[in-house]
């Protein structure tokens, strides 16, 4: 089964025009599951999600923004995936899903990482707790607010301890870091 997945830092969805752009793109791309980061929405409800997705056949999980900062929204087509469990953390929202057609069980985790390098270790610990709870296939997406390599950020010329920690987290958990597509680097 091919999954149409989208992970997108929307940089705010409080503006009605921005929501309309998001809705149109989700409709055009016919996604099965999406992760929207940095929603900046402090109270997400079903009407808000329905308006974005444009179909009643949805389920969703959210980590609401705190004082219009952050926020992660996962939305999926419930004709494709059945929700088995949800975990909402400080920096992530995770959902355990089963494919309706193939019964494949996997975890989809959306992240909006802390902007402070000193807080990154809390994100790694949070994700490891979810991994211990659901030791199966994962798809980990989002904006980690950290880079692995200096070439990923304009003007960055050297590795920082936080970059080494991020690379170590990825490698020690056998994750695959897919390249960024469709947007410029920060």
PLM feature spans:
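A shared catalytic/ligand-binding motif for oxyanion handling
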Residues: 1-186
């Amino acid at each position: 089964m091919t999954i149409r997945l989208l992970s997108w830092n929307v940089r705010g969805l409080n503006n009605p025009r921005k929501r309309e752009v998001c809705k149109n793109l989700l409709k055009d791309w016919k996604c099965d599951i999406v992760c929207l980061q940095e929603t900046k929405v402090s109270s997400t409800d079903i009407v808000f999600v329905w308006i974005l997705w444009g179909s009643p056949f949805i389920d969703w999980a959210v980590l609401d923004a705190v004082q219009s900062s952050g926020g992660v929204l996962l939305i999926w087509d419930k004709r494709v995936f059945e929700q088995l469990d949800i975990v909402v953390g400080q920096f992530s929202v995770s959902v355990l899903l089963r494919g309706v057609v193939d019964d494949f069980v996997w975890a989809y985790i959306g992240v909006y990482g802390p902007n402070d390098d000193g807080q990154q270790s809390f994100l790694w610990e949070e994700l490891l707790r979810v991994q211990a709870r659901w030791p199966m296939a994962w798809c980990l997406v989002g904006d980690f607010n950290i880079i692995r390599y200096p070439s990923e950020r304009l003007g960055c010329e050297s590795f920082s301890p936080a970059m080494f920690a991020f690379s170590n987290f990825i490698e020690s958990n056998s994750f695959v870091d897919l390249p960024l597509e469709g947007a410029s680097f920060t």
